[in-house]
């Protein structure tokens, strides 16, 4: 490590080694490791009065393209109001030690990640972004104001970023790429490594994801948000009783009339109401809805089937035959790197 520091550091960009060999076993994990590094970065930026400084979250087994820092600096300079941004990523599909079984497994898991975000955007949710801990950046002042990284052993990135994204003006950096390891792992209960390991243990590259009809149901609700703001409390029930059955059942359990009325009372205009509504119906609540509907109304689909349905919903699918999962992932990657414009309007 010391040799690496001697070789990596250069004028204007020193490299520091932080050693914490005695982490408490109960807390030791990726969340605590990420928190230690990001807390130290925030403290250094605070000491030189740079709250707008950038903290980048990365993983030791990932690698980046040479233009990463340049793209980060350019993006944050051009968007002074952005609190943070996700960086475009791809899992390595070839390379030393990556067999066909791992390749087929990671294709499906990455396709699942991209499908979920893009389906949520199709539904109209404003907080739909990738939230991988290995590929995001946040301003130091925002990091501190949101309480810093948590100590979760898995999902720490998702929970932290879904405190930042609702602040508004969250961004995406697609002019570079962070390349992620597809290795199987049993260190965490979910995530890339756990997903690959699960498929390898099952003996087949098969990954089930949420049925696309559940996102169509959400779209029916989210499309009505402006109408909910304009309506009187007495008519809210009529509006949501015209929605799909899975949505009606879920909203009935959540006292939806009272929620909408509270959002309306505390909103000066439609934009304010919309922000309040989606802070309530945040991505955590979306996942709760999806899990509930797949207990009663829908069965999960193999991810390639769901992804194809999403692509075909607007008539933009460019191949005249049934694609492989790898072909679908290539199309999703291409669309995502162009800023989500080529498939989802």
What label would you give each PLM region?
Residues 117-137:
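A recurrent flexible, glycine/aromatic-enriched loop bordering the glycosyltransferase active site
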Residues 152-159:
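Acidic donor-binding loop at a coil-to-helix junction in glycosyltransferase catalytic cores
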Residues 152, 164-179:
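Catalytic donor-sugar/metal-binding loop of nucleotide-sugar-dependent glycosyltransferases
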Residues 48-53, 57-75:
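Acidic donor-binding/catalytic loop of UDP-sugar-dependent glycosyltransferases
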Residues 173-194:
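Active-site donor/metal-binding and catalytic loop motifs
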Residues 198-345:
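Terminal low-complexity segments of carbohydrate-biosynthetic enzymes
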Residues 1-26:
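Acidic donor-binding segment of Leloir-type glycosyltransferases
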Residues 66-106:
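Conserved donor NDP-sugar-binding/catalytic core segment of glycosyltransferases
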């Amino acid at each position: 490590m010391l040799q690496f520091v001697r070789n990596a550091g250069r004028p204007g960009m020193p490299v520091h080694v932080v050693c914490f060999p005695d982490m408490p076993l109960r807390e030791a994990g990726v969340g605590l490791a990420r928190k230690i590094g990001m807390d130290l970065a925030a403290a250094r930026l605070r000491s030189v009065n740079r709250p707008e400084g950038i903290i980048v979250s990365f993983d030791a087994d990932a690698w980046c393209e040479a233009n990463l820092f340049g793209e980060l600096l350019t993006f944050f300079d051009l968007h002074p109001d952005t609190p943070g941004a996700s960086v475009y990523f791809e899992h390595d599909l070839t390379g030393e030690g990556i067999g066909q079984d791992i390749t087929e497994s990671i294709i499906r898991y990455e396709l699942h990640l991209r499908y979920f975000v893009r389906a949520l955007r199709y539904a109209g949710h404003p907080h739909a972004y990738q939230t991988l801990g290995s590929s995001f950046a946040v301003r130091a002042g925002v990091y501190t104001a949101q309480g810093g990284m948590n100590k979760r052993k898995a999902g720490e990135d998702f929970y932290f970023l879904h405190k930042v994204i609702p602040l508004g003006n969250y961004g995406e950096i697609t002019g570079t790429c962070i390349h992620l390891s597809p290795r199987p792992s049993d260190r965490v209960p979910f995530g890339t490594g756990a997903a690959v390991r699960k498929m390898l243990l099952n003996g087949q590259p098969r990954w089930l994801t949420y049925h696309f009809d559940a996102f169509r149901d959400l779209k029916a609700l989210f499309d009505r948000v402006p109408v909910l703001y304009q309506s009187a409390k007495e008519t809210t029930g009529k509006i949501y009783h015209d929605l799909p059955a899975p949505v009606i059942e879920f909203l009935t359990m959540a006292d939806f009339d009272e929620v909408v009325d509270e959002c309306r009372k505390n909103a000066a205009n439609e934009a304010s109401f919309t922000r309040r509504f989606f802070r309530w119906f945040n991505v955590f609540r979306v996942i709760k809805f999806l899990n509930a509907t797949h207990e009663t109304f829908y069965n999960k689909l193999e991810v390639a089937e769901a992804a194809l349905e999403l692509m075909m919903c607007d008539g933009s699918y460019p191949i005249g035959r049934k694609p492989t999962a790898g072909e679908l992932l290539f199309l999703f990657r291409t669309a995502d790197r162009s800023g989500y414009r080529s498939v989802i309007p």
